[in-house]
Amino acid sequence: MSTVYKLKTSERAPKNEDEDEEYVPVQNGQGNKHSAGFVPIKQKVLVLSSRGVTYRQRHLLNDLVSMMPHSKKDSKLDSKDRLYQLNELAELYNCNNIFFFESRRREDLYLHIARAPNGPTVKFHVENLHTMDELNMTGNALKGSRPILSFDKTFDTAPHLKVVKELLQQTFGIPKGARRSKPFIDRVCTLTIADGKIWFRNYEIRENEDKSKDPVTLIEIGPRFVMTIINILEGSFGGPVIYKNDTFVSSTMVRAAIRNQAAQRYVNRQESKLERQVRAQQNVIPEDPLDNVFA
């Protein structure tokens, strides 16, 4: 009898179509009911790095993961030549965006942002990076909160910048109702273009209780870094190059130029030394016969 009673009580009551669906707010991204007309946007970012990243690069990656609750962090990728395998990895984890840190020579850091599985893919060179621990800023925001993405108006001036803006928006933008996200907006992420580079900053939105001051103040949290666009591929880690930055100079070429300058300075010193020896041999002072008169 108890089994029959449980089966009867577990049956759902018929739904009344005349009644409107009650609005239940989403808490921590786990709610199943939404307001009428709300369609959740499913965005999930696969975050991983290559072998050989330094501790500063690893800490920067961890800071970005803490800012993106809709991300899925995976272990390091062993191969740097077969990046197309990241598409299979993204499909395995049900991710539609890929955020990949590639480290070379333990000095240069490259960032790949791709839309899986069909692309496009943008490759950046990351420099001037500073983690939250290094900056030690006073700003603080709720972990898992959704940010306001502030893009420079320069992003709308060129077609390739519009593509970059869309990929950055899908990567750093946390959709409403995302998993592990909080229903709060208390920070601003700014992406500004200056000197042909993209500058990333993260600020806290703090309200001032003093009415004589501005009602809202922005306080930097961190991290901060600068990105330079290298190229844009049509596919996800493959396909034809649809944009290439001709003004980009790699760090390897810069270091090679510095070494060549140092080597050229050494060559110039040796040539000057040889010229002094030749002049000394050509301009020999003749012996004076009167030097040995009183000897």
From Swiss-Prot:
User: In the record, what terms sit under GO molecular function?
Assistant: RNA binding; rRNA binding
| Span list, region Disordered | 1-22
Looking up InterPro entries in the UniProt record yields: Brix (IPR007109), BRX1 (IPR026532)
* Cited function: Required for biogenesis of the 60S ribosomal subunit.
Instruction: Write down the Pfam families for this protein, in alphabetical order.
Output: Brix
Domain Brix, by residue range, is: 43-238
Q: Name the family.
A: Belongs to the BRX1 family.
Could you list this entry's UniProt keywords, alphabetically sorted: Cytoplasm, Nucleus, Ribosome biogenesis
Q: Which GO terms describe its biological process?
A: assembly of large subunit precursor of preribosome; ribosomal large subunit assembly; rRNA processing
What protein name is recorded for this chain? Ribosome biogenesis protein brx1
Keyword Disulfide bond assigned to the entry: answer is no
Compartments where found: Nucleus, Nucleolus; Cytoplasm
Q: Its principal location?
A: nucleus
Presence of keyword Nucleus: yes
Show the GO cellular component annotation of the record.
cell division site; cytosol; nucleolus; nucleus; preribosome
UniProt-listed SMART domains:
Brix (SM00879)
